[in-house]
């Protein structure tokens, strides 16, 4: 039997398990939920991975199976159809609902995932940027990248220094914001709204295992996905003829398997490129989670740890 909402005090608890793909987050989340259950506390796992939100990517997103869930409630897994793009703001809105539901029933919400933007949006909120003028957006998107960069250097020098020269999408975004609103993107982002970080008692854990071990696991996982039907999953996606710019079509493994299905590359090339794409993604996530979260968030580099020690605050409610 879980606790009642009154038992939480002023700030109800939220557990957070984050880190790169293939780092073992899902397993730790379930272990934590079961450990809490032994202490008389219910828990629910809430997905914070931008690929696992899509119903079309059960295999390629490594969504936990029923056996892996071990009877623990899991929410926001496979909730979006691939024809829709799930933005960070949309995910955060749904996550807030699931967190509130869990707290209302006395359960501990356990956020688990590797999408830093999702987590940051949920905890810190989003900048209330007004809609961008359509004519301004169209004009900026039509600019060659070198002209867009030159304009950004003049109109938002800080953004120009911060963004990579080849990052056309973010360059255009920064430029359209300053031209449409008269304020820079960084200025807007200093006034975020809607975050829950100051309203909950956060119990975070960052999974940062040995990189060599992580990359080897990425390689094994991609091959396992193929054994579990990833090619059929991509074949079904291709048959839907979705917009190639949609997130579901840009998910790790989709492009590589699609190229193989179309006869553009052979199977060994597909496996090698899929594994490389997975490792590259894990590397970017690893770097982000090592440096971006607050320094006082625990970082774990080995699985040889006691949940009750890392999440001691959760077991004291």
Curated annotation (Swiss-Prot):
Residues 49-52 are annotated as: Interaction with substrate tRNA. InterPro entries: Dimethylallyltransferase, IPT, P-loop_NTPase. Keywords: ATP-binding, Magnesium, Nucleotide-binding, Transferase, tRNA processing. Disulfide bonds: none annotated. The keyword Nucleotide-binding applies. One of its GO terms (molecular function) is ATP binding. Its EC number is 2.5.1.75. ATP binds at residues 19-26. It is an enzyme of class 2 (transferase). Its cofactor is Mg(2+). The record marks 115, 137 as: Interaction with substrate tRNA. GO terms for biological process: tRNA modification. Substrate binds at residues 21-26. Gene3D superfamilies: 1.10.20.140, P-loop containing nucleotide triphosphate hydrolases. It holds the Pfam family IPPT. Catalyzes the transfer of a dimethylallyl group onto the adenine at position 37 in tRNAs that read codons beginning with uridine, leading to the formation of N6-(dimethylallyl)adenosine (i(6)A). Monomer. HAMAP family: IPP_trans. PANTHER family: TRNA DIMETHYLALLYLTRANSFERASE. Belongs to the IPP transferase family. This is tRNA dimethylallyltransferase. It comes from Erythrobacter litoralis (strain HTCC2594).
């Amino acid at each position: 039997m879980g606790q009642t909402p009154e038992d939480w005090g002023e700030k109800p608890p939220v557990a957070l398990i984050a880190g790169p793909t293939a780092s073992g987050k899902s397993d730790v989340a379930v272990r934590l939920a079961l450990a809490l259950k032994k202490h008389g506390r219910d828990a629910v796992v809430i997905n914070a991975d931008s690929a696992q939100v899509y119903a079309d990517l059960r295999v390629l997103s490594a969504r936990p199976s029923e056996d892996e869930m071990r009877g623990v409630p899991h929410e926001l897994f496979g909730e979006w159809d691939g024809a829709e793009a799930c933005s960070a703001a949309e995910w955060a809105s749904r996550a807030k609902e699931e967190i509130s539901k869990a707290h209302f029933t006395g359960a501990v919400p356990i956020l688990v995932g590797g999408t830093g933007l999702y987590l940051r949006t949920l905890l810190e909120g989003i900048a209330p940027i007004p809609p961008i003028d359509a004519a301004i957006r169209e004009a900026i998107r039509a600019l060659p990248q070198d002209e867009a960069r030159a304009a950004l250097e003049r109109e938002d020098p800080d953004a120009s220094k911060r963004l990579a020269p080849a990052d056309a999408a973010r360059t255009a975004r920064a430029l359209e914001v300053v031209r449409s609103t008269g304020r820079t993107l960084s200025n807007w982002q200093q006034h975020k709204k809607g975050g829950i970080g100051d309203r909950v008692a956060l119990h975070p854990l960052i999974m940062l295992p040995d990189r060599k071990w992580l990359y080897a696991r990425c390689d094994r996982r991609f091959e396992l996905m193929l054994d579990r039907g990833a090619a059929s999953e991509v074949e079904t996606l291709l048959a839907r003829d979705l917009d190639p710019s949609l997130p579901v079509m840009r998910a790790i493994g989709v492009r590589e398997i699609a190229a193989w299905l179309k006869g553009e590359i052979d199977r060994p090339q597909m496996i090698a490129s899929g594994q490389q794409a997975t490792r590259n993604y894990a590397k970017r996530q690893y770097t982000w989670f090592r440096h971006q979260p607050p320094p006082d968030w625990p970082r774990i580099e080995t699985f040889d740890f006691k949940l009750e020690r890392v999440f001691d605050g959760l077991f004291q409610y």
